[in-house]
Amino acid sequence: MKKFCFAVLMLINTALYSQNYDAGFSKPIITENGNFTYYELPPIQTSEGVLIFLDRNLGALSNDITSSDSWGDLYQWGRATDGHEKRLSDTTNTIALTYRPANNEFIVDSSRANDWIVRPDDDLWNDSLSTNNPCPCGYRLPTEKEWRAVADLGYEIKPTGTGAYYISFGKGQLDLPCAGLRNAFTGNFQYQGMRGYYWAGDVMSKGMSGCMDFNKAE
C-alpha cells in the first residue's frame, strides 16, 4: 500500500487532508519535530493501487473541514519544511543557491518562472526518501497519476457552511478543503476557501511541477 501526506500550494505548492478519520482503523503518526499528530485514513482502492492518506494537510491545526484551521501550510514545490510554508512567513526576492536555503522566507521573483532556486531539481519530492520530502517518515506526496486515479472515483464540491468550500472524492472517502494558494510572484494569498491546489510529488515535464486543483465553480 502507498502512503501519502498532503502539501498545499503556492502557485507552485500543496499537502493532503480528510475529515473521515476512522478511530477503529487509524494509528497515530508523529512528525519529526513533534509539533503535529496525524492519523491514517482507511485505505482507498484506486486504479493506481491501494492509497492511504493522512487525516489533514501538513501543518493543519484541525481536521474539522468547516474550519480555516484545516487549511494547513503552503509549500513551494520541492522545498523542505523550513518555515517558508507558514502563512505568516515573510517574503524575499533572493533566489536560493542550494536546495536548503539559509532563510525561512517565502521566495518570490517574477523573473524566474515560478521557481525559488537557481538550479531546479525535479527529484526533490519524488518519493519518501527524497532530499526535501516534507511528509512524516514513510510518507510522500501523491504522483500526478495517483491524483488522477483519486479524481476518477468521482467528486463533488460542497459548501462547509461557513462561506468556504471543500471537495469530496469517492462519496466521502477523501475530503480536501479549498485552502487557496500563495502567489509565486507577489507572496499574496489567493482563493482561500474558494479553490484548492494540491501538489504532486513528481513533475509533468522537465521543470513543470504538477498539482491537482479544483474550485467551487466545478
Task: Indicate residue ranges for each PLM-predicted region.
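C-terminal, surface-exposed recognition/capping segments
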Residues: Y38, P42, T46-E48, D55-H84, ...
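Enrichment for repetitive, rod-forming helical segments
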Residues: L9-M10, K86, T94
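Bacterial Sec-dependent N-terminal signal peptides
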Residues: M1-Y21
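Boundary/junction segments of secreted and surface-exposed precursor proteins
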Residues: Q19-E40, I44
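Zymogen propeptides/activation segments of proteases
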Residues: Q19-N20, G72, D82, N93
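Compositionally biased, low-structure terminal segments
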Residues: C5-A7, S18, S26, G170, ...
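Intrinsic-disorder/low-complexity regions
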Residues: I12, N103, M212-F214
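Surface-exposed intrinsically disordered loops and tails
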Residues: K27-E32, S89-L124, P159
